[in-house]
Amino acid sequence: MVRNLEDFCNEANAKHIRIEDRERYTGHFNALKDMVYSYWKKSKGLDKLVKGTTLCGGYGDNLKVSKPDEYDLLIHLVFPENDKIIVKADASNPGNVLLDMTKVMEIIAKQEHNKPVFDLLQKIVNNKKQLLEDKLQSFLHGIMTQTLNKMGNRIEVQGEISHLSYKKCGPAHNILVKGPCEYSVDFVPAIKLSAAQLVLAPEQRKHFGGTLYWDAVPKPMKPAKPDNPSFRTSFYEAERSLLHGKQNLKSAIRMIKHIRNEKNKANLKSYHIKTVFLWQVMEKDASYWEKPKKEILIEMLGKLADLLALTPRKGRLPYFWDPKLDMFADLTDDQRTDMFNCFRKCEYVFRKADGNLNDDNENSVHSSFKGSGRNGQKMEKTSTESEQKKPTETKPNAKVESTPVKPNPKPSVQEKQAKPNLADQKKCTKNANGTKSKTTTPKPS
């Protein structure tokens, strides 16, 4: 019997925010990851660039909730003479950088063993020798298409066949798996750069700390722009360090993500939530995260609502690594109003329950974590996107070995309800840091 709100938060973490079939899904994912990676490593030109992967997103941060049906994988690309890439901030696009390959090309033009890379670069840079996002992605799209064709658009794991479909979505190359395990993987290419190549402002440079590497992700502009030299910065490793060791921080993030999923607020991306907490890590003393989960949850729900508020000057969510970029800029007023009302109401419900967790208040809190209350009442739908609810995030067990893969057989023959936005329902969206989203419509990731 739950006796107070803190007990309820602990129970919610144990009962509702859990991973089912973790090992089975992880083994299957590892098999697919290894096979795709091996084909990329065999591709002419790309073979010299591919230098490892990083599991990121909810799994990498240990922030995923619910089913293990969505993975984000950075595929690191490192050019010969990579440290000679001249990185400049893109003044026209906050949070983005330009990659000047002039010195790299001057050196490798004289190296016979790097001729395939030089030939590739000649096709994917402009007349200023700046690397072009769309040209690089077009090349990788061809590689991934060939990869799926060679695999017969299927994979066999432990004697069971799963069918694969591929689509390009934002910066990600997404593979949807249908079979005994159904999930999707975003393969996100990322140019791996060193700390010496940072172009951060002094304050943000301080947050980067002792991290050795960061990435430039070929994220398309909105709308798509041909011959685009602008790449989105990504600081996954530095962010992981900033969130590490903050006792109840990750529990609070998981609870907010779970509430978002249950309320079907797919326009609020996981990276939005993560960014709210990154800013709070800078503002709060380390001891703050040792407070009870309920206190952190209530305050963070309030912070989130404040940022979504349509005030005369509008709330905004600055990108942690370049505050000139507002991560809420692409949201419509209806979307913001819908989410503001949702999270402000949740804040009110939790504050009320914290003062008096009677049966009615407990049922209201319960409804925030599940689709129905204790007595089985159906939770009122709070979003016009309720039919597009997307599953949530958690970290796979790193100790699970990749499952053996057999060769593939040949294929057999403020209170207004936001209005539905059909364009939003159809388009692919990505994590605001440029490394996912993920890929269904619209994706909460």
UniProtKB/Swiss-Prot annotation:
GO MF annotations in UniProt: 2',3'-cyclic GMP-AMP synthase activity; 3',2'-cyclic GMP-AMP synthase activity; ATP binding; double-stranded RNA binding; GTP binding; metal ion binding
Positions annotated to bind Mg(2+): E70, D72, D186
Official protein name in the record: Cyclic GMP-AMP synthase-like receptor 1
Catalytic activity: GTP + ATP = 3',2'-cGAMP + 2 diphosphate; GTP + ATP = pppA(2'-5')pG + diphosphate; pppA(2'-5')pG = 3',2'-cGAMP + diphosphate
Lineage: Eukaryota, Metazoa, Ecdysozoa, Arthropoda, Hexapoda
EC number: 2.7.7.-
Low complexity bias spans: 435-445
Transmembrane segments: none
Regulation: The enzyme activity is specifically activated by double-stranded RNA (dsRNA).
Organism from which the protein derives: Drosophila erecta (Fruit fly)
InterPro entries tied to this protein: Mab-21-like_nuc_Trfase, Mab-21_HhH/H2TH-like, MAB21L/cGLR
Basic and acidic residues composition bias: residue spans: 377-398
GO BP of this protein: cellular response to virus; cGAS/STING signaling pathway; defense response to virus; immune response involved in response to exogenous dsRNA; innate immune response
Residues binding ATP, per UniProt: E70, Y71, D72, Y236, E237, A238, E239, K257, S270, Y271, H272, I273, K274
Gene3D superfamilies: 1.10.1410.40, 3.30.460.90
Residues where GTP binds: D186, R232, T233, S234, F235, Y236, E237, A238, E239
Similarity remark: Belongs to the mab-21 family.
Cofactors: Mg(2+); Mn(2+)
This protein's UniProt keywords: Antiviral defense, ATP-binding, GTP-binding, Immunity, Innate immunity, Magnesium, Manganese, Metal-binding, Nucleotide-binding, Nucleotidyltransferase, RNA-binding, Transferase
Protein task: Nucleotidyltransferase that catalyzes the formation of cyclic GMP-AMP (3',2'-cGAMP) from ATP and GTP and plays a key role in innate immunity. Synthesizes 3',2'-cGAMP in a two-step reaction through production of the linear intermediate pppA(2'-5')pG. Acts as a key sensor of double-stranded RNA (dsRNA), the presence of dsRNA in the cytoplasm being a danger signal that triggers the immune responses.
Start and end residues of each stretch annotated as Disordered: 357-445
